[in-house]
Amino acid sequence: MMPTGNFDLNEVKRRMQGAVQSLKHELGGLRTGRASASMLDPVQVEAYGSHMPLNQLATVSVPEPRLISVQVWDKSMVKAVEKAIVDSNLGLSPATEGQVLRLRIPELNEERRKELVKVAHKYAEAAKVAARHVRRDGLDVLKKLEKNHEMSEDDQKRHADEVQKVTDGTIAEIDQLLAAKEKEILTV
């Protein structure tokens, strides 16, 4: 959380950039057309009593342009990995052979493109919500500082305006990332 003794706008900026970086990572997983090991980066597997990234349970490789191979290290985790991939909303159906899952990357039809755009919108909305939470936290710190007479009302309003400008810039960056990804998905 933010320091309560004084206000740090850089902390607000850093946390908002965290939301943007998270969105970039999630959108990066929405690949179009070609297979990529990073497509599976967002996949979380329920394993050993917690959620773990797929790459901590298996080796992911791309032997062909439209095929992803997932070599699960622990035989007892194959079903959990398979379920996580199916539940990930990436539109991939694993074909399991022992401890190896093969994922054919389907040609993107119009329906799948629209589904991917919806998923991208969902990710972008989550990033906007995260940015708004950071804004709220920052404004709460400012209100406390003013209430405790550690900051003047004028300074509080000035800092609140700065927080709003950072928020507006972050939301605009999120919208820009979403528009670029949407264009990439819909380009046939």
Curated annotation (Swiss-Prot):
**UniProt GO molecular function:** ribosomal large subunit binding
Query: In the UniProt record, does the keyword Mitochondrion occur?
Result: no
Where is this protein primarily located?
cytoplasm
Show the InterPro entries listed in the entry: Ribosome_recyc_fac (IPR002661), Ribosome_recyc_fac_dom (IPR023584), RRF_sf (IPR036191)
> Could you tell me the Gene Ontology terms of the biological process aspect for this record?
cytoplasmic translational termination; translation
Q: Which UniProt keywords apply?
A: Cytoplasm, Protein biosynthesis
Protein location: Cytoplasm
So which residues are the signal peptide here? none
Q: Which Pfam families match?
A: RRF
Membrane-spanning segments: none
Any single Gene Ontology cellular-component annotation = cytoplasm
Keyword Chloroplast assigned to the entry: answer is: no
Q: Which family does it belong to?
A: Belongs to the RRF family.
Question: PANTHER family this protein is in?
Answer: MITOCHONDRIAL RIBOSOME RECYCLING FACTOR PSEUDO 1, RIBOSOME RECYCLING FACTOR
Function, in words: Responsible for the release of ribosomes from messenger RNA at the termination of protein biosynthesis. May increase the efficiency of translation by recycling ribosomes from one round of translation to another.
- In Swiss-Prot or TrEMBL terms, this protein is called Ribosome-recycling factor
What organism is the protein native to?
Answer: Bradyrhizobium diazoefficiens (strain JCM 10833 / BCRC 13528 / IAM 13628 / NBRC 14792 / USDA 110)
